[in-house]
Curated annotation (Swiss-Prot):
This is Large ribosomal subunit protein bL28m. Found in a variety of normal tissues including spleen, testes, thymus, liver, kidney, brain, adrenal, lung and retinal tissue. Belongs to the bacterial ribosomal protein bL28 family. The keyword Transit peptide applies. It comes from Homo sapiens (Human). The lineage of its organism: Eukaryota, Metazoa, Chordata, Craniata, Vertebrata. Keywords: Mitochondrion, Ribonucleoprotein, Ribosomal protein, Transit peptide. Component of the mitochondrial large ribosomal subunit (mt-LSU). Mature mammalian 55S mitochondrial ribosomes consist of a small (28S) and a large (39S) subunit. The 28S small subunit contains a 12S ribosomal RNA (12S mt-rRNA) and 30 different proteins. The 39S large subunit contains a 16S rRNA (16S mt-rRNA), a copy of mitochondrial valine transfer RNA (mt-tRNA(Val)), which plays an integral structural role, and 52 different proteins. Interacts with OXA1L. It holds the Pfam family Ribosomal_L28. PANTHER family: 39S RIBOSOMAL PROTEIN L28, MITOCHONDRIAL (PTHR13528), LARGE RIBOSOMAL SUBUNIT PROTEIN BL28M (PTHR13528:SF2).
Length: 256
């Protein structure tokens, strides 16, 4: 007899179908349910399901098994390009007969300053060499953030940047270079392929807890009293009626 009514791996999906989670926008729920394989960073995939064993010439099945990666909290405040900590063990004195010791492999980190054309701001960010190479390949920070999917960014800071960029592109914010409209139009035209509706951009990069709080605040907005709605409608009707009726002009007698 099973211990649970539903398998454990289904609990998170079932949670999204109940309560306030079920009232979240459809595009946000789809982004949570999408499971994409991140780009391999710490291992090289075989690229095939079978290979020939050089010893006996037989075909053998091979499988790509990703190395477990631990992303510390500081990785969410920088751009590590998918790199993280690898937890493992090594032999003491490089001797297989001696005991094994715990070992943590960490990426080399650098602090660099980047400029965002869309946000018109400079950021000092902790990055890795892989991140610098990816930014160079994408021809700038903005293209790197907008092109890289969530599972490859692996950074809350990166997703917050993406949300800010998408919101500015969706709103065509005039606060960007207000003294130079031509430059502003050129920037918006340069990144127009990434523009999405503002209603979707507001939810990009939010965690489930942040999305639930946002939905709760939207639902708890103070309702407008009915008498204010009726008064506004009455005033509008009276204004339209006054404009539609012809004006009556009384002629005065010449002797008066």
């Amino acid at each position: 007899m099973p211990l649970h009514k539903y398998p454990v791996w289904l609990w998170k999906r079932l949670q999204l179908r109940e309560g306030i989670c079920s009232r979240l926008p459809g595009h946000y729920l789809r982004s949570l349910e999408e499971e994409r394989t991140p780009t391999p960073v710490h291992y090289r995939p075989h690229g095939a399901k079978f290979k020939i064993n050089p010893k006996n010439g037989q075909r053998e099945r091979v499988e790509d098994v990703p190395i477990p990666i631990y992303f510390p909290p500081e990785s969410q405040r920088g751009l590590w390009g998918g790199e993280g900590w690898i937890l493992g063990q090594i032999y003491a004195n490089n001797d297989k007969l001696s005991k094994r010791l715990k070992k943590v492999w960490k990426p080399q980190l650098f602090e660099r300053e980047f400029y965002s054309e869309i946000l018109d701001k400079k950021f000092t960010v902790t990055v890795t060499m892989r991140t610098l190479d990816l930014i160079d390949e994408a021809y700038g920070l903005d293209f790197y953030i907008l092109k890289t999917p969530k599972e490859d960014l692996c950074s809350k800071f990166g997703m917050d940047l993406k949300r800010g960029m998408l919101l500015r592109l969706a709103r065509q914010d005039p606060q960007l270079h207000p003294e130079d409209p031509e430059r502003r139009a050129a920037i918006y035209d340069k990144y127009k392929e990434f523009a999405i509706p503002e209603e979707e951009a507001e939810w990009v990069g939010l965690t489930l807890e942040e999305a639930i709080e946002k939905q709760r605040l939207l639902e708890e907005k103070d309702p407008v009293p009915l008498f204010k709605i009726y008064v506004a409608e009455l005033i509008q009707q009276l204004q339209q009626q006054a404009l539609s009726e012809p004006a009556v002009v009384q002629k005065r007698a010449s002797g008066q």
